[in-house]
Amino acid sequence: MAKSGLLLIHPAITTTPEEVEKAKADAVAADVKIANQFLINKVNEGSVKLQKGIYDVIYYLTPEAPDAILFPKKLIGALNEALKVGGVLYGLSDKYKIDALVNDFDIVSDSGKYHWVKKVNMAVKAEPVAVPLKKSEKSEPSKTLPSFKKAGESKLPSFKKAANKPLPTFKKKVEEAKPKVEARVHKAENDDDELEDEEDENLFDASRSKYFDEDDSESLDEDDLLNEEDAKNIGGITMITCGKSKTKKKKACKDCSCGIKEEEEAEIDNIRSQQDTVVKFTEDELTEIDFTIDGKKVGGCGSCSLGDAFRCTGCPYLGLPAFKPGEPINLDSITDDL
């Protein structure tokens, strides 16, 4: 007897009807009769409903590659219900392997064509079976339970009440009064503190006096501490030896009052005046280097009026602002530097 089959078609496969005919021919060769043929989108929308447990084989025909198949996962459970126990589903790949296991499919890929098989143990539900209980052939005589006699009521022991005797009385021991001990406090007077301070000062003075002997026999004369060279310079004048001429020269003390300090200041002023006369320029000499006056000598660059960026390293106008050609420039401010 031929198996009942279902053919589900992808909408894109309708453009190649030869693929559909080939799939039907393969089914007939496998002894499968295609009972129904539906578009997968119709089943997904619910316009076509599959009956439960009537198909032995379901074929899904799609032009997609096995790794790129797009199949609605909710239909995997519906296809499982449409198959009979042990039914086979062709056309899906390992991309939906987890969904197949969840919906009670076994995956077969070892031999032949890859397919899914509906599990038998999950589809068939075990029905409850009644098991009769057999009685034992030899009926054992019923055993009577042991009987227990109620213990006789025994009389409780009786106790005689003791005679009422008065309790012994105890007198509180009288505590002997302890003699009060007054704390002896020695009150120090202020006079004692003053006496102690005076005694400490006397001891301190006595300890210091041993380092200061007032004997006149050990006093030194201050003149005995000076040597001959110190005696010569006792006048307060310091002699300085010149590094070139090797001659000694007097130098005034810090608080000189003998007139040597004034002589040194006059000598310094004389040297300064001689230096000023050596490097001082006359007005004509200053005019010769004035580049702004026509007919006078000019610098090699001729750009002194443009500013420091255009002046030579030895230009006398360095540091001055830029000026117009022909504008008189006063160089008195730099005479001290020349």
From Swiss-Prot:
One of its GO terms (cellular component) is cytosolic [4Fe-4S] assembly targeting complex. It is found in: Cytoplasm; Mitochondrion intermembrane space. Residues 301-315 are annotated as: Fe-S binding site B. Pfam families: CIAPIN1 (PF05093), DRE2_N (PF16803). It comes from the Eukaryota. A motif (Cx2C motif 1) lies at residues 301-304. Coiled coil: none annotated. InterPro entries: Anamorsin (IPR007785), CIAPIN1 (IPR046408), Dre2_N (IPR031838). Its cofactor is [2Fe-2S] cluster; [4Fe-4S] cluster. A motif (Cx2C motif 2) lies at residues 312-315. Residues 166-232 are annotated as: Linker. Its main location: cytoplasm. Residues 181-223 are annotated as: Disordered. [4Fe-4S] cluster binds at C301, C304, C312, C315. One of its GO terms (biological process) is negative regulation of hydrogen peroxide-mediated programmed cell death. Residues 190-203, 213-223 have a biased composition (Acidic residues). Residues 1-165 are annotated as: N-terminal SAM-like domain. Residues 242-258 are annotated as: Fe-S binding site A. The C-terminal domain binds 2 Fe-S clusters but is otherwise mostly in an intrinsically disordered conformation. The N-terminal domain has structural similarity with S-adenosyl-L-methionine-dependent methyltransferases, but does not bind S-adenosyl-L-methionine. It is required for correct assembly of the 2 Fe-S clusters. Monomer. Interacts with TAH18. Interacts with MIA40. PANTHER family: ANAMORSIN. Component of the cytosolic iron-sulfur (Fe-S) protein assembly (CIA) machinery required for the maturation of extramitochondrial Fe-S proteins. Part of an electron transfer chain functioning in an early step of cytosolic Fe-S biogenesis, facilitating the de novo assembly of a [4Fe-4S] cluster on the scaffold complex CFD1-NBP35. Electrons are transferred to DRE2 from NADPH via the FAD- and FMN-containing protein TAH18. Belongs to the anamorsin family. This is Fe-S cluster assembly protein DRE2. It comes from Candida glabrata (strain ATCC 2001 / BCRC 20586 / JCM 3761 / NBRC 0622 / NRRL Y-65 / CBS 138) (Yeast).
